[in-house]
Design a protein with these regions (language model features):
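Active-site core segments that coordinate phosphate-bearing ligands/cofactors
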Residues: 4-64, 75-86, 90-93, 114-269
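General small-molecule cofactor/ligand-binding pocket signal
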Residues: 97-103, 127-129
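Short linear loop/turn motifs
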Residues: 100-108, 215-218
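A charged helix-plus-loop insertion that forms the helical arch/lid used to bind
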Residues: 1
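Nucleotide/phosphate-binding loop and acidic/charged catalytic motifs
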Residues: 67-71
Length: 269
């Protein structure tokens, strides 16, 4: 409901202008609106809004902080200028004072608190840095920082990540436009169910969890006429639809379990 309000009433064009993105169910802004609409008593108690890693940094340093890459996925950040969007904060009914200070990922936010240093038996000179979102951090680790560099990551979800020196927005908003390292930006497509599809199929349906044996059987197959749409948790890219559902297509009486296993793998690929 909150995503529909943002995308349809506020409008995708305005959202994209404010934040370089449109509303997805996983983003923070629609969640804030949900709390505002459903739990106004809790909304009134909000002092600071932080992402999980930022809360850990706060506990270690006492500093309310976030970084540009992770904050990009909140739908509250003016990604182009790497600062909070006043328009989005107003739409959500929160103030900049309720938000954490935005840092570049590599920046030091402070030193570890003395009491934490004592408890963990580490020097008080240990620095706490802002950090990064998972895909942005992985991209730095794989060298996906230079202009035009790309990586593909398959885990529970699947992502295609493209680094760019220049700010740009996908005209269809099918890709996320986020801040990246070294003052760069990145475009990212996120498929919500990737390797998790294979895990679901093997453990819940096949019931063996014997991936190696199933892979060996698939190697004997050729062209497969069974197709699988891997929308087990809705979808983000290229179709923003939380209600999308997974489907097998093209099944006949001759369809085997191995055909369906191959379809699951090919559907993700």
């Amino acid at each position: 409901v909150e995503c529909d309000y943002l995308n349809q009433i506020i409008g995708k064009e305005k959202l994209s202008g404010y934040t370089a993105n449109i509303a997805f169910t996983g983003f923070t802004a629609p969640k804030i609106l949900w709390v505002k609409n459903k739990e106004p008593e809790n909304f009134a108690r909000i002092r600071k809004i932080m992402l999980p890693k930022d809360y850990i940094a706060y506990q270690l340093s006492g500093v309310h902080c976030t970084d540009v890459s992770d904050a990009s996925g909140m739908l509250l950040l003016d990604v182009k200028h790497r600062k909070w969007s006043p328009e989005m904060l107003e739409i959500c009914g929160v103030t900049e004072e309720q938000m954490a200070k935005v840092y570049e990922s590599y920046e030091t936010v402070g030193n570890v608190l003395p009491e934490i240093a004592k408890e963990l038996d580490i020097p008080e000179t240990v620095r706490i840095v802002a950090g990064a979102g998972d895909n942005a951090a992985a991209a730095v680790g794989t060298g996906t920082v230079g202009d035009g560099r790309c990586n593909i990551s398959l885990g529970t979800s699947g992502t295609i990540f493209i680094s760019s020196e220049k700010f740009g927005v996908d005209r269809n908003n099918a890709l996320h436009a986020f801040a990246h390292a070294d003052g760069h930006y990145h475009l990212m497509g996120c498929m919500l169910s990737a390797a998790s599809c294979n895990k679901w199929w093997m453990e819940e349906i096949v019931g063996t969890g014997d991936y190696a044996a199933e892979q060996k059987d698939i190697e004997k197959l050729g062209e497969n006429h069974v197709f699988f749409l891997p929308y087990l948790m809705g979808e983000r890219s290229p179709h923003n639809n939380p209600n999308a559902r997974g489907t097998f297509i093209g099944m006949t009486m001759d369809t085997s379990r191995t055909d369906m296993t191959q379809a699951v793998l090919e559907g993700v690929a």
